[in-house]
Structures are given as structure tokens and as C-alpha cells.
Amino acid sequence: MRVIKLGGSLESAKTLLHCLNRIEQQYRNQKVVIVTGGGVFAEQVRIAQQHWQFNDECAHAMALLAMQQMARLVKGLKVDVELAHSVRAIQQSQSHIIVWSPDIDELNNAGIPATWDITSDSLAAWLANVLSADELLVIKSAVIDDTLSLAQLAERGIIDKAFCECVANSVFTVRVINQQCL
């Protein structure tokens, strides 16, 4: 099984549909779980938090709702994908392409901290670990220098601050690529 994290900025870069088409073509005979970033919806959470000054716990829950909205968007664009709201639903699915719509309670029960240091990047790593995935492929709109380590990508803000810790003891392969390399 492969977990593919689609950066939220792919939506605003207008390449989301292209990436979904490429995933369908390239992984036709493999089980794939798509994790979406929150995109423009998550940006609105950041703006609202700055304006209203609510705590990170509230922002975290709202950012997860943003990921759910993006998952619904993917389902709207690709009606054949299955929308799964839990790890168990993913594990039981017979579908070939699944898009994860994260459940707030499931993540809270797993002890995922409510902080902007943990974004959909780290949540994709958490999911890949829980599912015992073979690979975590993180697709970004940013230009990726493939000579940089994960720590260097985190320093540059390409992946979130907690990502390296989330994949530190993982047995799956981790790749971070630009959308053009898909």
C-alpha cells in the first residue's frame, strides 16, 4: 500500500486534477491512500486564528475540517475514489484508490498534538505508519531540490516541523517530490 500526500497548494496551483489523473494512471494496480492538505480552506483557518486569537486546539480541529473539505473536493473530481473517514475504513476498503477524510476523534485518541507544527504532512506520515504502508510519497507544488535531506526540507518550510520525527522510525520509503515529477 502506498500513501500519497497531495499538498494543499496544488489546488491553488490548479494542478490538483492533473496529479489525480497521474495517480490513476501510474498506480492502476496498487492500493493507494490519498491524503490531502487543507489548501485554501486551511489558509482561512490561519487567517481566522490571527483575527480572532482562538487557541491551537480550535485551529487544529478547524484545519482537520479543511482537510475533510479537500477530501470531498477530490471525491467530487474523481467519483470512483472511495472516501474513508477512519483507519479501519481504509483497512477494510476493497477500493483501489481511497481518499482519507480524517476523523478528529480518531486523531485525538491517537494523541496527535494540536499545533501548527503538525500539518497534513505529518498526519500523512502518521497514517502511513498505522497502515504499515510501503511508501509515503509527498507531492508539493514547491520546487524540490532532491539533494536536500528531510530535515533541510523542514527547515525551508517545504514539509512541516514535526515530519522528520513522524517518519524517524518508519520502515516505509519516504519521497518528497514536485508535482511535475509525478
Features from the language model and the residues they span:
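Nucleotide/pyrophosphate-binding catalytic subdomain
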Residues: 1-181
